[in-house]
């Protein structure tokens, strides 16, 4: 295992206290000024990272020394993370920024086992930590002396004088009673395997145009705000053994892509429809949230579909950016995601180790990151009943490209397992100090792992999802449940398609994705445009040059569709930022007994 670089930074608290100041978090009474001093002790030959994997901060609070341990939240972003914004003329601009060496951390105060700190180290230190049961905030002071920071209790932030914000959820989608009943039944082996498997939510974040205007028409300001909140969201769900990773951030910098209005119900419906018909075509993800600067009617601060996770339309939520203090908005985001994960509002009898819990119907200013006992039971019951599959997919070891850190809950190169710190680990199979399996253990996690041993060969670990899928079986030699599917070329969808890598791609299905449920495949004459070799028709590209289709391959180039809403009988989907989007998908049936492969219509009996 690669040794983690440890960086010590001393925060010397000068004997100076302020009585009142206006900070990014709002008006603050009673704060301390501290000055970070960074002390780096690099091992010989080590490469200096911009943001280290692990850091310590030493400083005084109320005259008492504290040590804050931080570890980079390496799973905050997916490996293929992208950002999208729009030019003033409406042109979509998508980039794939490097987020490997980001500046967002989780941590804890020394001698406290719980992860309770969320810190951004991008431009100074900004975030919060818990000390002796109280929340403290730290943020840079915008002074000529750039090293000055303010440390203050959360209770000393003046709260905005307005009615308490509430969640608008009133069981607005799935029936809740059957979920409760399901928790009373005995678990099947498949349900038990599902519960034991690690869970991941791949999150698509959208900021509306009012958010863009609110933060000075600055993409950087909006991005920073969203990142700060996502870091806290990730921390909150770690307590539920769910890892939230941001796959994409889209900022509506030119105009809103839906009608965002004070009616939260109407806005959620519009966003859910847009997500299903547009967003899912851009990139695969599990859940989408819209952050808006609009004021919803009444006290509503957010709305989500109860139990909607993994559904193309209903795995959505909307949240109002209702407070300057970003962690209060992050809690609202966690609350709405909790609804998507099958958790209803807490009743009066529900409790957690805080004054208020995440799923309270009224959003508290107490800033609790804890789910109640009721929430945990309801979430478990929802998982047992529905077993949503999208949240089982996790990054592979090689997806995490920075040096491994034992104790960060990610199994990385050189590690057998990672169950957190020795103080928090509850895994009987894993040695938390070394991230190696305990003596006699064969595995610690995986659908083919049971009580630290591999399940027997032939044991079903995942049921077939459709006609092109196959039930997956354990090998007896691994904890992994290897995905299997029907061989390519097998007829599917009533002979309208052929199986391809576990799916059944058809032109009609692709047309409805781009042009709606009433769309159809265009007449053959439209596909003759693929003979041109330009934006409107080609079969493949060589060194960015579009190559025209051969006559026998025209059904394997640009997809042409017709729709009642379109007068033109030959419609294509074209995006300058992603020219290949809108091409006929590989494996699609192009003639009887033939399917598309690399822009050619080939016989399904040959490998493709």
Swiss-Prot record:
A Pfam cross-reference name: Pep_M12B_propep
Identify the residues that bind Ca(2+) 1: 405, 408, 410, 412, 415, 418
| Glycosylation sites per record | 501
Residues that hold Zn(2+) according to the record: 335, 339, 345
Q: Where is this motif: D/ECD-tripeptide?
A: 467-469
The Disintegrin domain is annotated at 403-488
Enumerate the UniProt keywords alphabetically: Apoptosis, Calcium, Cell adhesion impairing toxin, Disulfide bond, Glycoprotein, Hemostasis impairing toxin, Hydrolase, Metal-binding, Metalloprotease, Platelet aggregation inhibiting toxin, Protease, Secreted, Signal, Toxin, Zinc, Zymogen
Name recorded for this polypeptide: Zinc metalloproteinase-disintegrin-like agkihagin
């Amino acid at each position: 295992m690669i040794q983690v670089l440890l960086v010590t930074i001393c925060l010397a608290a000068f004997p100076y206290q302020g009585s009142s100041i206006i900070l990014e978090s709002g008006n603050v009474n009673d704060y301390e000024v501290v000055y970070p001093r960074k002390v780096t002790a690099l091992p010989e030959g080590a490469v200096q990272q911009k943001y280290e994997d692990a850091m310590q901060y030493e400083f005084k609070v109320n005259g008492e020394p504290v040590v804050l341990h931080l570890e980079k939240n390496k799973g905050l972003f997916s490996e293929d993370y992208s950002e999208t914004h729009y030019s003033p003329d409406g042109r979509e601009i998508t980039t794939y920024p490097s987020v490997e060496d980001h500046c967002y951390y989780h941590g804890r105060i020394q001698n406290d086992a719980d992860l309770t700190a969320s810190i951004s180290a991008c431009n100074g230190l900004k975030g919060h930590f818990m000390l002796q049961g109280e929340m403290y905030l730290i943020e840079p002071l915008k002074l000529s002396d750039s090293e000055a920071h303010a440390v203050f209790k959360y209770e000393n932030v003046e709260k905005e004088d307005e009615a308490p914000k509430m969640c608008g959820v009133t069981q607005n989608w799935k029936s809740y009673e059957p979920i409760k009943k399901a928790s009373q039944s005995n678990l099947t082996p498949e349900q038990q395997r599902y519960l034991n498997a690690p869970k991941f939510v791949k999150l698509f974040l959208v900021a509306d145009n009012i958010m863009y205007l609110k933060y000075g028409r600055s993409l950087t300001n909006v991005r920073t705000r969203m990142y700060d909140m996502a870091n806290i969201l990730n921390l909150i769900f770690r307590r539920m053994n769910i890892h939230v990773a941001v796959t994409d951030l889209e900022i509506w910098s030119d105009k809103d892509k839906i009608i965002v209005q004070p009616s939260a119900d109407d806005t959620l419906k519009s966003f859910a429809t847009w997500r299903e018909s547009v967003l899912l075509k851009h990139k695969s993800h599990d859940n989408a949230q819209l952050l808006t600067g609009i004021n919803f009617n009444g006290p509503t601060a957010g709305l989500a579909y109860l139990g909607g996770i993994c559904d193309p339309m209903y795995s959505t939520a909307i949240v109002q950016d209702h407070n300057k203090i970003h962690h209060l908005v992050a809690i609202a985001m966690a609350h709405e995601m909790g609804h998507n994960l099958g958790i209803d509002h807490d009743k009066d009898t529900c409790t957690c180790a805080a004054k208020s819990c995440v799923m309270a119907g009224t959003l508290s200013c107490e800033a609790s990151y804890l789910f109640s006992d009721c929430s945990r039971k309801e979430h478990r019951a929802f998982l047992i009943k529905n077993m949503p599959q999208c949240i089982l997919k996790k990054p592979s070891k090689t997806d995490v490209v920075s040096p491994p850190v034992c104790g960060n809950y990610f199994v990385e190169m050189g590690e057998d397992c990672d169950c957190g710190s020795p103080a928090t680990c509850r895994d009987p199979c894993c040695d938390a100090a070394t991230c190696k399996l305990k003596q006699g253990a064969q595995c610690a996690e995986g659908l083919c792992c049971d009580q630290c041993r591999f399940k027997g060969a032939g044991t079903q670990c995942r049921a077939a999802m459709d006609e092109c899928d196959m039930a997956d079986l354990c090998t007896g030699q691994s904890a992994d449940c290897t995905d299997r599917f029907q061989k390519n070329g097998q007829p599917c969808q009533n002979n309208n398609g052929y199986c391809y890598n576990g799916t059944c791609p058809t032109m009609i299905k692709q047309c409805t994705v781009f042009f709606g449920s009433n769309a159809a495949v265009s007449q053959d004459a439209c596909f003759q445009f693929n003979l041109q070799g330009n934006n409107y028709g080609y079969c493949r590209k060589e060194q960015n040059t579009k190559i025209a289709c051969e006559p026998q391959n025209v059904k394997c180039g640009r997809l042409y569709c017709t729709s009642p809403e379109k007068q033109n009988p030959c419609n294509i989907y074209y995006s300058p930022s992603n020219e290949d989007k809108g091409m006929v998908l590989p494996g699609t049936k192009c003639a009887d007994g033939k399917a598309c492969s690399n822009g050619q219509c080939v016989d399904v009996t040959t490998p493709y």
